[in-house]
Amino acid sequence: MDVSQLTDAELRDSLKSHGVSVGPIVATTRKLYEKKLIKLSDGSINNQSNLNDSQFNEDSLIISSSPKKSPPQRVFQNVSAATAAATTSPESDSDDCEESMRYLTEEEMAADRASARQAQSNKGGFLGSTITFTILFVFIAVFAYFLIENAEQLKLVAETNPEDTI
């Protein structure tokens, strides 16, 4: 069997039939998946779970009782292919890392364009924004004028009554 001639979907299906969890097949991952399939079809890997991720079981931690200080040995239990297949559904979009989409009909595109035009016409245009900006500028200018006038009066009051300070 020539693995390089398989399409991405055929490669994915054949790997899934061997119990291998398959991610997206792109140019960078295709050769890796082809090698896995060749090893599986040749029978050089008898245990399929070596290709899948292993799951660490905390109960199976073994600590060596030797006098030298060596790091503890960890025992990993492999997840069976049936358990791995049961946790992911083959029909979900996340298996292929693709999102579903559909083409819009002409009526839907026309309705979308009409709502975009409606939203833009409700903005008020250039004249409305100019009037709003002018009113805001006048309000800020009047506020600044009264602030400066009152600051001068407060300064004069503070200078005439020096005995009020402690």
Curated annotation (Swiss-Prot):
Against CDD domains, the record matches this protein to: LEM_LAP2_LEMD1
**Where in the cell?**
Nucleus inner membrane; Nucleus envelope
* Topology feature Nuclear, residues: 1-127
Segments on the Perinuclear space side according to the record's topology features: 149-166
What are the annotated GO cellular component locations?
Answer: nuclear envelope; nuclear inner membrane
One Pfam entry name: LEM
Tell me how this protein sits in the membrane. Single-pass membrane protein
Q: What tissue specificity does the UniProt entry give?
A: Ubiquitous. Expressed in all cells, except in cells undergoing spermatogenesis. High expression in hypodermis, neurons, pharyngeal muscle, body wall muscle and gonadal sheath.
The answer to whether UniProt assigns keyword Membrane to this entry is yes
For the LEM domain, which residue ranges apply? 1-44
Q: Which keywords, in A-to-Z order, does the entry hold?
A: Cell cycle, Membrane, Nucleus, Transmembrane, Transmembrane helix
Q: Which PANTHER family match?
A: LAMINA-ASSOCIATED POLYPEPTIDE THYMOPOIETIN (PTHR12019), THYMOPOIETIN (PTHR12019:SF9)
Q: What's the stated role of this polypeptide?
A: Nuclear lamina-associated inner nuclear membrane protein that is involved in cell division, nuclear structure organization, maintenance of nuclear envelope integrity and nuclear envelope reformation after mitosis. Involved in chromosome segregation and cell division, probably via its interaction with the nuclear intermediate filament protein lmn-1, the main component of nuclear lamina. Required to organize the distribution of lmn-1, nuclear pore complexes (NPCs) and chromatin in mitotically active cells.
Q: How does it assemble?
A: Interacts with lmn-1 and baf-1.
State what protein this is by name.
Emerin homolog 1
Q: Which organism is it from?
A: Caenorhabditis elegans
Name the gene behind this protein: emr-1
